[in-house]
Amino acid sequence: MAFDRLKMPIGDAMFTQRSVRRFKSDPIPIEDIHLIIDAAVKAPNGGNRQIGRFLVLTDRNVIREFGTIYHEAWWAKRKEERGWTKRADIPPEEKNYKLASELADEMKDVPCVVFACAVPPGTANSVIPATQNLMLAAHSLGIGSVPTTLHPTVMDRFRAMFAIPKDVAFHFCIPLGYPRTAYGSSRRRPTSETTYLNRWGAPVPWT
């Protein structure tokens, strides 16, 4: 696998990566998907047990069918957590939820979706690093992504739709596609507010 195609410097990849929820419909070449998944499995994993598994969707009809389930799952979670049942319920100040609700509508049209799962014991500690590797590799190829989840309401139907065994743990749904709009760098709180030195609450020597 020609991993030298991932030419973006690691610093650029990490510091310019951000969640992308608006995608073009252009298909992603299968060789790029292959490279992205190869990058994912190179991530650290507990005991080198390699329990991570990836189910990749590229069939438009299958993605469209999954999009219906994803839409239902997204709104089920919003109703449970916030009492929202439609976009008009989302307060104006909750801009991130507005954007996420657009993905709930558009998931059916994305060119590729990856499900990050794990075989028994099914823990996420090996899947989370792989998912980040996957998204960084995609970013290096100009492909946007965002990690999302589902809701218990749809899990039985989700498993049946894709013949996923009961003992396989689902962790993330990751849509992939070329960004439809230009994005700036992400905004984060200063690490001086979120990091401590030697003892909880003790400040770090930077601002």
Regions found by a protein language model. Give the residues of each.
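Short alpha-helical scaffolding segments that buttress acidic/His motifs in well-ordered protein cores
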Residues: M14, I36-A40, I174
